[in-house]
C-alpha cells in the first residue's frame, strides 16, 4: 500500500513539474535566467528562440509520460510497454541528477539549487518500488 502511495506521489510530482514547464513558456527567458542557464540553452538551440519553446514542451511531455508510467506500475492505468526498463531509466537519471546536484551544492549553495536537488531525490524515493 505504501509503495502504491509512493508511486502515485511520484506521478503527481511529475505532472506538477510538467505543468510548471508549460507555465514557464509564458516567461521562458526569465525562467532560464533564474536558473542561470539562459546562455547554455541558447547555445544548445543554436540561437534559435523557437527551439527553446520546443525543448521546453518536449520536457513537459517527458515528465508527463514519466508520471503515466508511475500510475501504470501502481496499477491505476493499463500496463504500458517496457514498464520495468522505463522505471530503471527514470530512477537512474534522477539518481545521476541528485549526485550532480549535491556536487553543485557543495561548490555553491543556493536554495533554488537545493530544491532542484531535493525534488529528484524525492522522485527516486517514490519510483524505487517500481523497480520490483
Regions found by a protein language model. Give the residues of each.
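Interfacial loop at the N-terminal end of multi-pass membrane proteins
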Residues: 20-55
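Hydrophobic alpha-helical membrane segments
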Residues: 85-101
